[in-house]
Amino acid sequence: MTTETRSLYSQLPAIDRLLRDSSFLSLRDTYGHTRVVELLRQMLDEAREVIRDSQTLPAWCENWAQEVDARLTKEAQSALRPVINLTGTVLHTNLGRALQAEAAVEAVTKAMRSPVTLEYDLDDAGRGHRDRALAQLLCRITGAEDACIVNNNAAAVLLMLAATASGKEVVVSRGELVEIGGAFRIPDVMRQAGCTLHEVGTTNRTHANDYRQAVNENTALLMKVHTSNYSIQGFTKAIDEAELVALGKELDIPVVTDLGSGSLVDLSQYGLPKEPMPQELIAAGVSLVSFSGDKLLGGPQAGIIVGKKEMIARLQSHPLKRALRADKMTLAALEATLRLYLHPEALSKKLPTLRLLTRSAEVIQIQAQRLQAPLAAHYGAEFAVQVMPCLSQIGSGSLPVDRLPSAALTFTPHDGRGSHLESLAARWRELPVPVIGRIYDGRLWLDLRCLEDEQRFLEMLLK
């Protein structure tokens, strides 16, 4: 060991001496004595490695307390951090899908802070049923006889099949054997539920007679799966629920539908593409309809099943129901969200999902033009900052081929180097509230459809 190396090692402080420093008192109060000591030991090991490898001290050795504070502050950040979603995908699965309405946030907060009547009947002081209040709301909105709530729509499909068709066959069109994110496939779910898949028709064309010929003494259900995350176009044929229900009645076989996204309002009245609604399928005579709570409905993650009373009763009594049931926070948020649907005239103002989906391209364009000047002044030395038209998508497998006209701020490096775009995107991901855009066609795009807090956005990007 050289004299210089020995001298550098001698400059490393003892942990006890560091802890006696007044600057460490608040750190110990905030993060705990044990964690501070653990980190100091780790940092001393790091410093020794740097000395050994490069014959220098790390820069942070000049202020140990500051470095400890920086590291522990970063460590203490929640893994679920708020971000500004400027990806152009409104219901972004990786960013948590639907934003909750203020009424839902308030309801969840109350449910978290206090005991609630989750399974308690105030009328007779007996045990109640956790789905009761929501079932009443859902029946009022959809016209169903009863309803059941589980923790997501994949769970809803699993429960629906396991409780009504285990050990038997379920007839489904080949063109509806969907796969959604996370390799969730209808054939796999059927297998897990103990059902036998009987696929009929072809990928692009399925006729009523295909279902009829598939039915046998072991058939439990005729099933429709709404292909919400893809579209088959061209030379196609599919029968709708009303026609399938008529066939089911003739053959005395129930019809069930996995609707996927599930919208409780006619989106076309807001200028959006129409999606099938649960109430339409219930009116057509479908026995069970499942759909998601956190997609087009705009609520928390939940799986909702509405339908005939005797069918729902089979789901409620199945052992899987307890394993898949929703907790009090989910139920509180979902109830508050559903109550908004009782006043549809105010829905686009109070439901964030609908509010964002219905923002006009003109309004977003004006917003982009308002923000372009200060951002161009700040970033103009490296990037050309422009306002450009773009197309937003709904996301989460909803209306996959439909796009919403929008406007974006784009950042194009003057030198054309893609590494500069990656670097800029990385810098924005390190902001106190990360800004998430997308890199495409040699530009970094910030689709402003979901930007509502302009002031906070500007303050962070102009630092």
Curated annotation (Swiss-Prot):
Whether Electron transport counts among this entry's keywords is no
Q: Which domain of life is it from?
A: Bacteria
- Annotated GO biological process: conversion of seryl-tRNAsec to selenocys-tRNAsec; selenocysteine incorporation
Q: Please list the cofactors this protein needs.
A: pyridoxal 5'-phosphate
EC class, as a word, reads transferase
- Keywords (A to Z) from UniProt: Cytoplasm, Protein biosynthesis, Pyridoxal phosphate, Selenium, Transferase
A Pfam cross-reference name: SelA
EC numbers for this chain: 2.9.1.1
Where on the chain is N6-(pyridoxal phosphate)lysine found, per UniProt?
Answer: K295
* One example GO MF annotation: L-seryl-tRNA(Sec) selenium transferase activity
One GO cellular component assignment for this chain's record is:
cytoplasm
According to its UniProt record, in which pathway does this protein act? Aminoacyl-tRNA biosynthesis; selenocysteinyl-tRNA(Sec) biosynthesis; selenocysteinyl-tRNA(Sec) from L-seryl-tRNA(Sec) (bacterial route): step 1/1
| Subcellular location per the Swiss-Prot or TrEMBL entry | Cytoplasm
Q: How does it assemble?
A: Homodecamer; pentamer of dimers. Binds only one seryl-tRNA(Sec) per dimer.
Q: Which family does it belong to?
A: Belongs to the SelA family.
Biological role stated in the UniProt entry: Converts seryl-tRNA(Sec) to selenocysteinyl-tRNA(Sec) required for selenoprotein biosynthesis.
Q: What is this protein called?
A: L-seryl-tRNA(Sec) selenium transferase
